[in-house]
Amino acid sequence: GRIQMNVLVINCGSSSLKYQLINSDSEEVLAKGLCERIGIDGRLVYQKEGMDKEITEAPMPTHKEAIQMVLDALHNPKSGAVKDLSEIDAVGHRVVHGGEKFAKSVVLTEEVLAKVEECNELAPLHNPANLIGIRACQDLMPNVPMVGVFDTAFHQTMPRKAFLYGLPYEYYEKYKVRRYGFHGTSHSFVSKACAEYLKLDLKNSKIIVAHLGNGASVSAVLNGECVDTSMGLTPLEGLVMGTRSGDIDPAIMEFIAKKENLDIDGVMNVLNKKSGVEGLSGVSSDFRDLEAAYNEGNPRAIDACEVFAYRVAKYIGAYVAAMNGVDAIAFTAGIGENTSFIREKIVSYLGYLGIKLDKKTNDVRGVEEIISTPDSKVTVCVIPTNEELAICRETVALVK
């Protein structure tokens, strides 16, 4: 039989689903795409490696129909990536919140899924959608092994001093209110890739990863283990993000609620969906638009970019303190990989670490590159993240 494995990686949102089929041997993507507007009207985007995107509008009342369409597309005689669905050897699912129950990836059994369900109240937007995707796959591919890869798992090595909030301790005991962190799969992948790229010994290193996308977080990785990260119980803590506020004085919530006559859901909606660089700039949550407005001298766009970069720099400084030093800083995700003027702003605050930016190499987009000068005391680099590949690797390791 075939030695290599084809792994279907699925990331289920509340009304969308992203997928990639990866050959685990060559690590090449055989096909990828997404389903959008599930439960509304439905649209499938499918792209076989080396071919054009195909877009199909079709009703998808639930995730089950969406996944059925993905499977149909994957073994379509014309543009399919496999001849038969039996060539899909395993499925890797992204699960957003594993709480304290999951410190690493696991094979999904009924027992495990019951535990995942217990984490639902910690991530009411994401986890139920992740579970629906898993159940739909089980129905459609009953004999294929499935693995859950948790966004929170990598951060489970944080010490108590880093994860406990200054709140009544009973909230932690009763409800597990504590800091969890997210993007763990990316932070783990990038910290390993960074050590490899720079020829550092991961087990004897201090690495700070800045995952800067529409959601953004920084992590401190000491000897290969996460010791702190900027997101908290939910992804709302920490950096200023695309539409999320990040750290604020909690009393602002009461103040705004009274002034604007909002209930708690209304205030949360503002903090999650209307804040961040979009709220500050009034332009966009997309840094391509922000950069254009910044270059035109739009004062609010300038504020948004300055506030964003300053907050990242402060967190990097905090994590140098947390690890009592740093060997390397890695930028990743959409903004981290592509937006050179933001990287330049962030690095401009780090001169005290003996870091100098190499303006030439900082102009790169989306490739591994060292962007600090050879005489910098700390190496700063860009390392593209690949969460799907990371999920594929985790899946293979457990299913083999």
Task: Report residues per predicted region.
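Extreme N-terminal starter segment of soluble prokaryotic enzymes
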Residues: Q4-L8
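Short beta-strand-loop/turn "lid" adjacent to the catalytic site in phosphate-handling enzymes
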Residues: L74-H126, V147, A153-A162
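Adenine-nucleotide phosphate-binding core of ATP-dependent small-molecule kinases
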Residues: N269, G276-L280, F287-A322
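Glycine-rich phosphate-binding loop of actin/hexokinase-like ATP-binding domains
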Residues: F154-A257
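Catalytic phosphate/nucleotide-handling subdomain of diverse soluble enzymes
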Residues: L222, D228-D263, N269, A333-V364
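Short glycine-rich, Thr/Ser-proximal phosphate-binding strand/loop in the N-terminal lobe
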Residues: S16-M60, G232
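Phosphate/pyrophosphate-binding loops at sites that engage ATP/ADP/AMP, CoA/4′-phosphopantetheine
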Residues: A73-D89, C194-D201, I316-D327
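Internal helix-turn-beta structural module
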Residues: I302, E306-D327, G336-K400
